[in-house]
């Protein structure tokens, strides 16, 4: 009977998660709009944080409180909202140097500092939906035909859809230019990149609206505005400041990585074998991986590791390739090395935890649970980690914990009904008054409980009867 009940729970768990329990790499991530996806990558996020940090500091904002959101989209675009900086892969790939990227970020922070509002209707809709991020460039869930599940894998942040909600007047654009220039100067950065970025797209001004990049529909250009900005930044003391060799190298690595994942065929031509630079070799290794030639990819990753044995992202990449192509036992060691080299990166711990769970060894599954728990101490709203944890607890026969982890997953993807139902089921299987039981109760209370749910909680003393009306 217990076995039968557990089988029923497994079916319910799989249905609730809406996806297979096998993960595969790729960029088939959550769709935002036409040609847009939300993605995660520790290496790129770290580089973007370093680029953005002086800008936020100059604006009086703590960079540690800022979440960098990477959006896979061909067009260049960016937006800032409280606590969030959104950047498209198209912007990164088209920015010639870090200073151009920083210039666009400063312009967006200028809008934020100026209190320039998004289009009210769009922003209202945007603010009502959690922003859901996907797992990463290399490790995404294989979805069982569920677009809704695809939209809810990792973590939530405010202002979902803010890129589509922006719409500024020419006056607001000019003010944001001036504010951005001030921020860049205060940060000790040149405003040249900001002016040059907009000048590079001056031609967009004469295009019919349907032919323009979305960014330049929302941020209308004018020659007068560009010339005013050029005059302003050219007069600033730090105009001659240039990007450091280290910053330029990181920028090229970021672009090469994105090219390898997003444009593998193009990358093989863009970064041909004659180019022996690190970014080119990195791009080719990733491109072979994306073209499903694992042996060629691994050979090139191993060559890179011979030169950079302490690079956690190379070990991460090697582990991803091995995992995707079914070599789980071999994937464990490189993933352990990536975590050892960068222990504060939750996505790397998730990769390791995922592999350990897939090995189906009791000790490995238990260790996988530990790794996922550590990842969740950094990103407690990481829905994919909760989903993996539910699978691990289910494998260990810990039904109460599996149901609680599933409730956490559903809560973080915004499905309050499923979150409440699984939290109620978890309470039935957890020791009363334990921390986990109390957490399940909290989820019930914040997941739109019915009057009957509240009456049941009041009857058992979990809440005061006066709270039930």
Q: Whereabouts are the PLM-identified features?
A:
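Extracytoplasmic and endomembrane cell-envelope/extracellular-matrix remodeling and assembly machinery
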Residues: 31-35, 39-42, 46, 164, ...
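Catalytic Zn2+-binding segment of zinc metalloproteases
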Residues: 109-126, 144
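Helix-start (N-cap) detector for alpha-helical repeat units in TPR-like alpha-solenoids
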Residues: 278, 312-313, 329, 346-347, ...
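Canonical tetratricopeptide repeat
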Residues: 283, 317, 351, 388-389, ...
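Residue-level recognition of tetratricopeptide repeat
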Residues: 286, 320, 354-357, 391, ...
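Residue-level detector of the short coil/turn that links helix A to helix B
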Residues: 292, 326, 360-363, 397, ...
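Terminal, low-structured helical/coil segments at or just beyond the last alpha-helical repeat
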Residues: 395, 406, 412-469
């Amino acid at each position: 009977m217990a076995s039968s009940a557990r089988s029923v729970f497994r079916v319910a768990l799989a249905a609730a998660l809406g996806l297979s329990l096998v993960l595969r790499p790729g960029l088939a991530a959550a769709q935002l709009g036409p040609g847009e996806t939300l993605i995660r990558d520790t290496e790129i996020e770290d580089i973007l944080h370093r680029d953005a940090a002086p800008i936020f500091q100059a604006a009086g904002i703590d960079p540690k409180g800022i979440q960098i959101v990477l959006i896979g989209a061909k067009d260049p675009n960016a937006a800032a909202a409280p606590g969030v900086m959104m950047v498209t892969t198209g912007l990164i790939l088209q920015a010639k140097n870090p200073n151009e990227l920083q210039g666009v970020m400063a312009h967006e922070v200028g809008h934020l500092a100026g209190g320039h509002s998004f289009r009210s209707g769009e922003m209202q809709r945007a603010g009502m939906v959690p922003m859901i991020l996907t797992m990463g460039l290399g490790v995404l869930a294989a979805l069982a035909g569920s677009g809704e599940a695809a939209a809810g894998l990792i973590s939530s942040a405010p202002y979902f859809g803010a890129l589509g909600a922006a719409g500024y007047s020419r006056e607001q654009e000019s003010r944001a230019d001036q504010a951005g220039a001030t921020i860049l100067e205060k940060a000790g950065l040149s405003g040249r990149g900001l002016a040059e970025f907009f000048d590079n797209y001056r031609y967009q001004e004469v295009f019919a609206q349907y032919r323009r990049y979305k960014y330049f529909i929302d941020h209308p250009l004018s020659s007068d505005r560009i010339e005013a900005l050029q005059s302003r930044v050219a007069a600033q003391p730090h105009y001659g400041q240039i990007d450091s060799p280290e910053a330029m190298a990181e920028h090229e690595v970021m672009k090469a990585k994105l090219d390898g994942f997003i444009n593998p065929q193009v990358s093989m031509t863009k970064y041909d074998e004659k180019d022996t630079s690190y970014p080119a070799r990195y791009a080719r290794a990733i491109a072979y991986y994306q073209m499903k030639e694992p042996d060629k990819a691994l050979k090139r990753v191993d060559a890179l590791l011979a030169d950079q044995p302490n690079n956690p992202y190379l070990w991460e990449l090697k582990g991803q390739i091995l995992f995707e192509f079914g070599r789980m036992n071999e994937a464990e060691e490189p993933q352990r090395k990536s975590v050892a080299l960068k222990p504060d990166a939750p996505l790397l711990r998730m990769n390791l935890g995922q592999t350990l769970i897939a090995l189906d060894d009791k000790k490995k599954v238990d260790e996988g649970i530990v790794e996922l728990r550590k990842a969740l101490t950094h990103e407690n709203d990481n829905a994919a980690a909760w989903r993996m944890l539910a699978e691990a607890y289910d494998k260990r026969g810990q039904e109460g914990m599996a149901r609680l982890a599933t409730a956490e997953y559903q809560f973080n993807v915004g499905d309050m009904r499923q979150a409440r139902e699984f939290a109620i089921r978890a309470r039935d299987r957890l020791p009363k008054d334990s921390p986990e039981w109390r957490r399940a109760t909290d989820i019930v209370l914040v997941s739109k409980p019915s009057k009957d749910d509240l009456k049941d909680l009041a009857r058992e003393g979990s809440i005061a009867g006066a709270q039930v009306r």
